[in-house]
Curated annotation (Swiss-Prot):
EC code(s) of this entry: 2.3.1.191
GO biological process: one example: lipid A biosynthetic process
Name assigned to this protein: UDP-3-O-acylglucosamine N-acyltransferase
Metabolic or biological pathway: Bacterial outer membrane biogenesis; LPS lipid A biosynthesis
Organism: Aeromonas hydrophila subsp. hydrophila (strain ATCC 7966 / DSM 30187 / BCRC 13018 / CCUG 14551 / JCM 1027 / KCTC 2358 / NCIMB 9240 / NCTC 8049)
């Protein structure tokens, strides 16, 4: 697949500088791009690569255009432009292209137009698959689960029963949605399992990375709103709610009944306590331990930044003595006040 620069400019609302008839076949980095490639510059610290780049064209801002020695598409945000061009030139194969003979599909499953189901997939009774849904090899879709149009599951995804997924969703391999939440009562040391009777409701245009787990609700559904993106190896516990447009980076853990607002950004390996709320537009940096609600938009961090082992040992020793140091300081302050 190829587009001329003029065609790409029309798609992006960009301005062509150079030969608009040149064909672009793929995207590449500034350093590695060659003939037929388009690249981008979104950070001026990489501007020096422009002089040596062999790209056919560069996505660039008006401010950086004087430094560009080749053809260019000028637009406000080159990185967003790159993302859209990459979509147009995407050569990623589909999870499945037809219904494989080895797929096991219950008799009452409702299949939309052009549905594809890969080898050894299992689709149970009561499932509804919208138009252009793609189910990869080895997937399991449990009873009464619904997938909206154009949603895709890569190989070996598991959707338990009573899951609702909207349109244009993408789930990467190994992810499990709808397993039991961690719900138990304790009676004199004996754990009594609480059946998890809710489901999982996932909105439209949600993307979920590989090997992530999203538990079903205890009584009501776990909810993921529209336009949420979740990275690999995250744990979303029962009855968590994640608001519109929030991004969750890899290895994040969210305990039960956490409510995350709209447009939040959650850094990797963050840990959240349950039964609390995070307000809209909160940014939590990586490795944070969030034990209390966040009520004001802003950037939040916790943890000790990287040090040499020797420095870290000194810091740890001082932290262990902080209560003792506080008491000594208080005594000194009182003594000074008395004098």
């Amino acid at each position: 697949m190829a587009f001329t620069l003029a065609q790409l400019a029309q798609q992006l609302g960009a301005q062509v500088h150079g030969d608009g008839t040149l064909e672009i076949r793929k995207v590449a980095t500034l350093e590695k791009a060659g003939e037929g490639d388009i690249t981008f510059l979104s950070n001026k610290k990489y501007r020096h690569y422009l002089e040596q780049s062999k790209a056919t064209a560069v996505l660039i801002t008006e401010a950086d255009l004087p430094f560009c020695p080749t053809n260019a598409l000028v637009l406000k945000d080159p990185y967003v432009g790159f993302a859209r061009v990459a979509q147009l030139l995407d050569t990623t194969p589909q999870p499945a292209t037809d219904i494989h003979p080895s797929a096991v599909i219950a008799a009452d499953v409702q299949l939309g137009e052009r549905v594809a189901i890969g080898a050894n997939a299992v689709i149970e009774s009561g499932v509804v698959l919208g138009d252009d849904v793609r189910i990869g090899p080895g997937c399991f879709v449990g009873k009464n689960t619904r997938l909206g149009a154009r949603s895709r599951l890569w190989a070996n995804v598991t959707l338990y029963h009573n899951i609702t997924m909207g349109t244009d969703c993408l789930v990467q391999s190994g992810t499990v949605i709808g397993a039991d939440g961690f719900g138990y009562a304790n009676e004199r040391g004996e754990w009594i399992k609480i059946p998890q009777l809710g489901g999982v409701t996932i909105g439209n245009r949600v993307e979920i990375g590989a090997c992530t787990t999203i538990d079903r609700g205890a009584l009501e559904d776990t909810r993921i709103a529209d336009n949420v993106i979740i990275d690999n190896q995250c744990q979303i516990a029962h009855n968590v709610e994640i608001g519109y447009g929030t991004a969750v980076a890899g290895s994040t853990v969210m305990a039960g009944s956490l409510k995350v607002g709209k447009y939040c950004i959650i850094g990797g390996a963050s840990v959240f306590n349950g039964h609390m709320e995070i307000c809209d537009q909160a940014t939590v940096t990586g490795m944070a331990m969030v034990m209390r609600p966040i009520t004001e938009p802003g950037v939040y961090s916790s943890g000790i930044p990287l040090q040499t082992n020797k420095e870290w040992r000194k810091t740890a020793a001082r932290v262990m003595r902080i209560e003792e140091m506080h008491k000594r300081l208080s005594k000194l302050e009182k003594k000074l006040d008395q004098e």
